[in-house]
């Protein structure tokens, strides 16, 4: 029989170990990263957890951006929100008005962790900052710009220079016709049509998408994307669609799969699609800048970001917020932010991550990997090309999708579709404006 004092000591040790295990603070993190991107999110969380045994980040895929935002807000209303919610860029105004969030600069301040907001690339951080205080409301994470992916092997077969992607939309239309004639099922397809064909088309060509500097200067903004330049662009795509040179394959990122499986020779898609293209494409491909309108004065201007940021939700305890601050600080460290950028194709969110990536020779070894960054920094942004801050923007994107689909199916002219999209979208803007003043 073991001595009593030994048994008591063992019991005390066991209880202490149990207490330590129970002291681990679990931090739910809801996101929209799937495929290779989801694997990278899991990898970052696992590494943080290993380095910080008192905390456990639990990443959970909750569907696409719209589904995740809806799930997060619904969970907040029932008191079951995650600690961290990934929300796409057009959900920024909605999150600001939701009263469901705790600004990240407050989270860091209360946790006693130094937070250098100036470390983030200004054109990215400006999108997620409080326009009154200049402080970050959410932390940039997977920021992107649209880029052009093209099949170099298909270019060769069609008699096109594989090192020269089309620079203008007029060039792209010509290339798509030649690629289709050479035997490709699809010359060109586009992902995220509202973000690329209207929001970024407008910024890249120096045009406003909405008044009040795209909503940054007030909730009384009105949509302005039904002007002659945008109508002409959609009309060009309509003509390509009729000829079979442009294929509409879906509202989200469906065109990326059509590209990497070899169906479509070119696609405009998020720079964040690069991870899946690297993984699945079985041909030589290139990454080019977004085309611009050859008739646009002073184009190209600058791209506006897409992707998402990380919002901290209200209603958590102090220890949870301390863990959240530590995790966000971990993500922003140069080596981690650089790794995320290099593995996914998303933008380097900090200056240090960009510098480190360049010093490591990544851009020299991977031509085109800096395309998204060069587009974002192509020219200093104009007041109306730094992004969008429009209420109910996720719903407005759905309206834009519906109206553009009416063009691709021949039910409306480009002018009719964009006029209707502006009219319907403005109704949502007025509803949002009213809600912020009530």
From Swiss-Prot:
Organism whose genome encodes this protein: Escherichia coli (strain K12)
Known function: Part of the ABC transporter complex UgpBAEC involved in sn-glycerol-3-phosphate (G3P) import. Can also transport glycerophosphoryl diesters, which are hydrolyzed to G3P and alcohol during transport. The G3P moiety can be detected in the cytoplasm whereas the corresponding alcohol is usually found in the culture medium. Binds G3P and glycerophosphocholine, but not glycerol-2-phosphate. In the absence of G3P, UgpB can serve as a potent molecular chaperone that exhibits anti-aggregation activity against bile salt-induced protein aggregation. The substrate G3P, which is known to accumulate in the later compartments of the digestive system, triggers a functional switch between UgpB's activity as a molecular chaperone and its activity as a G3P transporter. Chaperone and G3P binding activities are likely mutually exclusive activities.
GO biological process assignments: glycerol-3-phosphate transmembrane transport; glycerophosphodiester transmembrane transport
Family: Belongs to the bacterial solute-binding protein 1 family.
Gene: ugpB
PANTHER family, sorted: ARABINOSE-BINDING PROTEIN-RELATED (PTHR43649), SN-GLYCEROL-3-PHOSPHATE-BINDING PERIPLASMIC PROTEIN UGPB (PTHR43649:SF31)
GO cellular component assignments: glycerol-3-phosphate-transporting ATPase complex; membrane; outer membrane-bounded periplasmic space
Keywords assigned by UniProt, alphabetized: Chaperone, Periplasm, Signal, Transport
Subcellular location per the Swiss-Prot or TrEMBL entry: Periplasm
Effect in UniProt of substituting residue 397 to V: Constitutively active as a chaperone. Not affected by G3P
Alphabetized Pfam families for the sequence: SBP_bac_8
Effect of residue 195 to S: Strong increase in the dissociation constant of G3P. Fails to stimulate ATPase activity of the complex
Record: residues binding sn-glycerol 3-phosphate: 65, 89, 144, 270, 307, 346, 397
Signal peptide: 1-23
Entries under CDD domains matching the protein: PBP2_UgpB (cd14748)
Name of the protein in its database record: sn-glycerol-3-phosphate-binding periplasmic protein UgpB
Record's note on what induces expression: Induced by phosphate starvation, via PhoB. Also induced by carbon starvation, via the cAMP receptor protein (CRP).
């Amino acid at each position: 029989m073991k001595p009593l004092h030994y048994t008591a000591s063992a019991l005390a040790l066991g209880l202490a170990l149990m207490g330590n295990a129970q002291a681990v603070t679990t931090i739910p993190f809801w996101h929209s990263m799937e495929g290779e991107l989801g694997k990278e999110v899991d990898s970052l969380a696992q590494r943080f957890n290993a380095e910080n045994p008192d905390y456990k980040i639990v990443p959970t895929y909750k569907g696409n951006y719209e589904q995740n935002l809806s799930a997060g807000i619904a969970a907040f209303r029932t008191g079951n929100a995650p600690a961290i919610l990934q929300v796409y860029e057009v959900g920024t105004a909605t999150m600001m008005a939701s009263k469901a969030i705790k600004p990240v600069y407050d989270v860091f301040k209360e946790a006693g962790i130094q937070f250098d907001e100036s470390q983030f690339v200004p054109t990215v951080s400006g999108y997620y900052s409080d326009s009154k205080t200049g402080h970050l409301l959410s932390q940039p994470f997977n920021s992107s710009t649209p880029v052009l992916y093209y099949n170099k092997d298909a270019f060769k077969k069609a008699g096109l220079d594989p090192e020269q992607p089309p620079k203008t939309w007029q060039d792209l239309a010509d290339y798509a016709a030649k690629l289709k004639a050479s035997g490709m099922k699809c010359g060109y397809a586009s992902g995220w049509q509202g973000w690329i064909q209207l929001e970024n088309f407008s910024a890249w060509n120096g045009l406003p998408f909405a008044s009040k500097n795209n909503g940054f200067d007030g909730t009384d903004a009105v949509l302005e994307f039904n002007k002659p330049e945008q109508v002409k662009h959609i009309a060009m795509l309509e003509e390509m669609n009729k000829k079979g040179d442009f294929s509409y394959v879906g509202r989200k990122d469906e065109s990326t799969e059509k590209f990497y499986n070899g169906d479509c020779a070119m696609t405009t898609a998020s720079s964040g699609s690069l991870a899946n293209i690297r993984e699945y494409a079985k041909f030589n491909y290139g990454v080019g800048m977004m085309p611009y309108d050859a008739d646009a004065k002073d184009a190209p201007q600058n791209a506006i970001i897409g992707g998402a940021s990380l919002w901290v939700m209200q209603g958590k305890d102090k220890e949870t917020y301390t863990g959240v601050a530590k995790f966000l600080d971990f993500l922003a460290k140069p080596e981690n932010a650089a790794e995320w950028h290099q593995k996914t194709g998303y933008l380097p969110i900090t200056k240090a991550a960009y510098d480190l990536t360049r010093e490591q020779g990544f851009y020299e070894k991977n031509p085109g990997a800096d395309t998204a960054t060069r587009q974002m920094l192509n020219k200093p942004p104009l007041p109306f090309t730094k992004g969008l801050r429009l209420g109910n923007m996720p719903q407005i994107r759905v309206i834009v999708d519906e109206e553009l689909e009416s063009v691709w199916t021949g039910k409306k002219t480009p002018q009719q579709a964009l006029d209707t999209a502006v009219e319907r979208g403005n109704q949502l803007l007025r509803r949002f404006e009213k809600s912020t003043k009530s």
